[in-house]
């Protein structure tokens, strides 16, 4: 697992009148700017993409995001892993139900029936809270992110958000809580766009097979805290 992927909103107080319709959504009372981020269990932010208008949903933001640019360019490092005796080429992200059924996304079951599916749902939802915790820590630690933004341009808001994210990671590293305290730079590779790489990314068959293998693997482990009580079934 590479981390948990999700989006959050920052209220834009000084949004120009002519842009308010573009940056507002029905479930938000004020104009907002979105942030897409990937966080791990130590709350380290591995990926951040800030700037999309608040009227968009997570899928629209994903289509603009550079999250999979390295994979499509053929410059991403290999990270194969094996689960349930099946070999997979790339790592995966934990997401909620709105994201597409790509090979690199693992989503929970909306209505699990099998006991193993119920255990998987519990574990998935518990692990995916990493990114929600990261957003909560960011907004509580940096008050400027929790209050309506007074900047007049998205460019300045983006700079503020990225600055807070960098400081957030620096604090985690300085406290010694980072899973990977040393960053090893990948060797430079000439970008080569590969159509097959994108096809592999969005492959639904791999998505469902990986999900099934993870359910079977989790079900084979002795994890009493994930057992479903008879009252909850």
Q: For each predicted feature, which ranges?
A:
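Short, well-ordered secondary-structure "scaffold" segments embedded in the functional core
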Residues: 1-233
């Amino acid at each position: 697992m590479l981390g948990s992927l999700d989006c959050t909103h920052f209220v834009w107080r000084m949004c120009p009148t002519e842009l308010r319709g573009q940056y507002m959504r029905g479930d938000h009372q004020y104009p907002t700017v979105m942030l897409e981020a990937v966080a791990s269990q130590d709350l380290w932010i591995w990926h951040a993409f800030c700037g999309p208008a608040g009227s968009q949903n997570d899928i629209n933001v994903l289509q603009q995001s550079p999250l999979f640019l390295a994979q499509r360019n053929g410059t991403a490092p290999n990270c194969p892993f094996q689960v349930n005796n099946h070999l997979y080429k790339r790592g995966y992200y934990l997401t909620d139900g709105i994201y597409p059924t790509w090979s690199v996304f693992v989503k929970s079951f909306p209505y699990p029936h099998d006991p193993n599916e119920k255990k998987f749902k519990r574990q998935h939802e518990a692990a995916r809270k990493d990114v929600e915790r990261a957003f909560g820590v960011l907004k509580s630690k940096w008050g400027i992110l929790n209050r309506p933004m007074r900047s007049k341009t998205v460019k300045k808001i983006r700079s503020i958000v990225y600055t807070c994210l960098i400081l957030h990671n620096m604090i985690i590293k300085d406290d010694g809580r980072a899973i990977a305290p040393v960053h090893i730079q990948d060797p430079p590779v000439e970008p080569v766009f590969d159509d097959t790489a994108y096809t592999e990314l969005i492959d639904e068959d791999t998505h469902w097979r990986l999900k099934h293998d993870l359910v079977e693997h989790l079900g084979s482990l002795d994890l009493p805290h994930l057992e479903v009580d008879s009252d909850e079934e």
